[in-house]
């Protein structure tokens, strides 16, 4: 067992990315000859500075499914601009029947979020945030809803550029 773990750790690329497993499900395909068992993994990867990616992996064995999920998450990363370790503004995200509300928080609040949302904020580098999920609690849908909301977030300078105003006018 120790040999296997040390081998798996040496295979990991040392690129400073934080990785978190969200879910591993055992899935079954029923065929004429019986049942074929497999595993589906859901993972998030982040750099601790606003980059975040989500990946799914499927395989007959758990470690292979996890590895595939991590690789896909590294390939599908998005950049989110943070503001002093929190979000720029209040934002909502939706995917399927899952909805999430994410609010910026002042220093000392911490990460107040449940389930898969907490893992996303931790690998992304968010230190202060309040988040609430409603509707479906399916981990896949919650992760997609959270990423949808984060992708919609704009900085004050982006909003000012769209409106043709100065940043001071936007911030009031």
UniProtKB/Swiss-Prot annotation:
InterPro entries: Ribosomal_Su5_D2-typ_SF (IPR020568), Ribosomal_uS5 (IPR000851), Ribosomal_uS5_bac-type (IPR005712), Ribosomal_uS5_C (IPR005324), Ribosomal_uS5_N (IPR013810), Ribosomal_uS5_N_CS (IPR018192), Ribsml_uS5_D2-typ_fold_subgr (IPR014721). Keywords: Ribonucleoprotein, Ribosomal protein, RNA-binding, rRNA-binding. It holds the Pfam family Ribosomal_S5_C. Residues 17-80 form the S5 DRBM domain. GO terms for biological process: translation. One of its GO terms (molecular function) is structural constituent of ribosome. GO terms for cellular component: small ribosomal subunit. NCBIfam families: rpsE_bact. Part of the 30S ribosomal subunit. Contacts proteins S4 and S8. With S4 and S12 plays an important role in translational accuracy. Located at the back of the 30S subunit body where it stabilizes the conformation of the head with respect to the body. The N-terminal domain interacts with the head of the 30S subunit; the C-terminal domain interacts with the body and contacts protein S4. The interaction surface between S4 and S5 is involved in control of translational fidelity. Belongs to the universal ribosomal protein uS5 family. HAMAP family: Ribosomal_uS5_B. This is Small ribosomal subunit protein uS5. The gene is rpsE.
